Amino acid sequence: VVQFQIQWVGTPNYTSGRGGRAPVAIVDHITAGLYPGTLNWMQNPAAQASAHYLILQDGRILQLVRDEDTAWANGYVERPTWRLYDGTNPNRYTLSIEHENLSGGHLTEAQYQASLWLHKQLIERWDIPISRDTIIGHNQIDTVNRPHDPGLEFPWNRLFLDLQEWQGGEQGVEPWKEQLVEQARQEGLITEYHNPDEAASKWFVLAVALNLLKKLGK
């Protein structure tokens, strides 16, 4: 079993404590930039931005903010699709992982293995269930300004399958079905994650059809 080390780097961009809350979900991001520029940005007080962790393409894991404190990663909310959003600042009850990546969300193998390991650590430490509501993308909090964060190539299917196998659970939905759902969401045909194996209600079919017509400018 590969063991990873977490390197503390710190940042002034955080709020002490969590206002009485505890983490209920992990939010995955991509940096849209490369190291060391991305780290410098998250350590710059003028940026007013940070994350708990930054995973580099070579597999190194950097920690900027303690789990017990509030990182400034998900505070801007617009048209959220995240079902656990309760109307308050999501930073208070989420853990954020940034992945060094210019765009698209494709991770190197070293980066993926580091991310998988870190997800396992956080799931165990904070008793976070493995689900699409508790391991999410930044785009589910801000669908308007962050529609492609962490991107279409982010390995959601592999991540969930590996996490489910690690916990000894079901293998879950086949990856190709998950990919279809994610592509439909990215294209605006649906607004949130849906289980591909659940039957579609009439209202859902109509909603997809109307979204398609809107996309076509009808």
Give the positions of each predicted feature.
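Secretory-pathway/luminal and periplasmic proteins that interact with or process carbohydrate-rich
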Residues: Y35, D142-D149, T191, K214-K215
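N-terminal catalytic cores of peptidoglycan-degrading enzymes
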Residues: V1-P90
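Exposed alpha-helical structural elements
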Residues: G37-T38, R158-D162, Q179-L180
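Short, solvent-exposed alpha-helical surface patches in non-cytosolic proteins
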Residues: E170-K218
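Solvent-exposed, acidic/flexible segments
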Residues: R21, A46, G87-P90, G104-Y112, ...
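Sec/Tat-exported extracytoplasmic proteins
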Residues: I30-A32, V65, L122-D127, L163, ...
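Basic/polar, cationic surfaces and motifs that engage anionic cell-wall
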Residues: V1-W8, T15-S16, R92, E100-G172
